[in-house]
Amino acid sequence: MTAREFLEATEKEKLAPYATRSADSAGRTLHGDEPDDYRTCFQRDRDRILYSKVFKDLQHKTQVFLINEGDFYRTRLTHTLEVAQHARTFARALRLNEDLCEAIAYAHDLGHPPFGHSGEETLNDLLKDDGGFEHNIQSLRVVDFLEKRYQRYDGLNLCFETREGIARHNTTHDHPDTPPEFQNYSQASLEAQVVNIADPLAYCAHDLEDALNAGYLRMKDLRNMENPLVRRVFERCSSRYPDFLKADTVLQSRILVRTLIEEANIAVIRQTSRNIELYGISSVEEARSLPEDVVAAPAGVWKNFDALKAYLFENVYRKPQVCIMNEKGKLIIRRIFHHLEKRPEMLPGIFKTRFDEAADSSGKRRVLADYISGMTDRYVMDLYMMMFEPYEKVMFEFRE
């Protein structure tokens, strides 16, 4: 028995009947590949994503605050790691496939362009007549086609279930159309649903901590919120830590966010366990055939969480400083896009080849979106300076 076969047997014994087992995977449907002797297929997917260049680039991509504004804010990479940690917690508690959850979590933001959601909005507007730009679908495009690590094929050649989790990543803010390939079931796997709920929980918690540390929010403003969830979190903080309100802002924010995460995680695990029992779910197929998600928080808790996110939107994301950062990012992307569209000879290597080979103007604009969305914040700002600032030096290596 190989190490992989032992791990697959362990999954069969330990995982819940509604969990996705690696031995039952639909496999690598894009390109055939021999199984590994010591890793399951989902462990292999996770490792392929972790070692990819595009994953490393997430450390230099904006979450909310531009990278060059300070090195103590979350980046797209730290966000991804926190989503994966939430997903592992849920998977372990619910006896789901932790490796699949982790792989989907690591890949869910690979298609995000520089400058966060403002960058995505700009590319979507630039491609409004060409199918638009949506970062979840772009993430699938990255792992299927754009990332280069193997001679035999483009992309990372991930398993069907990992790719489905990327394509069907669905949150309050993200509603991509499900590609036909993944429409066999009304619902995604429970592992994909876990990542779907881990994502907004993670970004709300860490955006709150970053905003408090940046001085965009004050602790007393949060204490005065008419939000039962926030009020309960403050009560728990005060009862657990008698000197909580006397601590400095940084320590207060860490205690507050840690307690908020704990409240949210407990609520999700309990509600999901109730849903599994309520529906009598005993197989993967049953979980996938339901009219609604199984992995969920209680309606009241989620309503309060949405209210907290709305509060952050009004009091952080609309701050003048953040708006200026966002508009700066939009201007940079838009100007580079239009300039490259007129002067494609400025495109490096493989992107120039793809641009020339594109069948029509729509295809050419898609190549430009692929190129720009793969840039880090720092690189796109350097490229902007190189293109438009007369005294900026241009003798540096272009990225492929």
Swiss-Prot record:
Pfam families: HD, HD_assoc. InterPro entries: dGTPase, Diverse_Catalytic_Enzymes, dNTPase_2, HD/PDEase_dom, HD_domain, PHydrolase_assoc_dom. Keywords: Hydrolase. Residues 76-204 form the HD domain. GO terms for molecular function: triphosphoric monoester hydrolase activity. Belongs to the dGTPase family. Type 2 subfamily. NCBIfam families: dGTP_triPase, PRK01286.1-1. PANTHER family: BIS(5'-NUCLEOSYL)-TETRAPHOSPHATASE, SYMMETRICAL, SLR1885 PROTEIN. This is Deoxyguanosinetriphosphate triphosphohydrolase-like protein. It comes from Syntrophus aciditrophicus (strain SB).
